[in-house]
Design a protein with these regions (language model features):
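Divalent-cation
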Residues: 1-199
Length: 199
């Protein structure tokens, strides 16, 4: 398989970046563009790997790729993953409504529960889902099937409605404050309590 840019890497997330107080949520338009792109690529068997960042910061993996920082559109994704183009290997990472990086390295899952027939792209999708709360979309270059990986589990050969539902669930998922935000709140509350004692 010529697509071999993904290698096994440890997750080195920064403590203060692991949970962010402000999460960049993606819009309904971004969902439409993602679904359109994935199934357009599937029809012509263009392989793709798209990681939707959620609360856990994926900066460690973003830095392994090439900066894109562009509004996500279906045509942009199709252009990135077009075969024999400089950006088609590796993963795209999406933050909010923007493609932040392409050709990113991801950790490969070594889970014994996965089929031995699973390819590198699918193992990378599961791998990043094991170390983060991201949702990863995979388009198979062999079959054109669209699959997703989330929390270490993979769903194979889903249809457009199911992908849209998964993206909506991620978009609307209840988010609790991250660690850094909780620390800031406790520090602020402590300062306010101290002020009240001295009034």
């Amino acid at each position: 398989m010529p697509w071999r840019i993904l290698v096994e890497r440890p997750f080195l997330g920064d403590f203060f970046n692991t949970g962010r107080g402000e999460i960049e949520k993606f819009s309904d338009k971004t969902i439409d563009e993602l679904v359109r792109a994935c199934f357009a690529m599937g029809r012509v068997k263009t392989g793709a790997l798209i990681v939707m960042e959620d609360e856990i910061n994926l900066g460690e993996y973003i830095r392994t790729g090439i900066d894109v920082d562009a509004i996500l559109t279906s045509q942009l994704l199709i252009n990135i993953f077009e075969k024999n183009t400089p950006l088609h290997d590796g993963a795209v990472i999406v933050r909010g409504n923007r493609v932040v990086s392409a050709t990113c390295y991801l950790p490969l899952s070594d889970s014994l529960a996965l089929s031995k027939d699973l390819g590198t792209r699918h193992r990378a999708a599961v791998g990043v889902s094991e170390v983060s709360d991201s949702l990863t979309i995979i388009v198979s270059e062999e079959t054109g099937a669209v699959s997703t990986a989330y929390k270490g589990q993979i769903e194979h050969d889903i249809d457009a409605d199911h992908l849209r539902t998964q993206l909506k669930l991620l978009q609307n998922r209840h988010r609790e404050p991250g660690k850094f935000e909780l620390i800031k709140r406790r520090f602020k509350n402590g300062k306010e309590a101290s002020k009240n004692l001295h009034k």
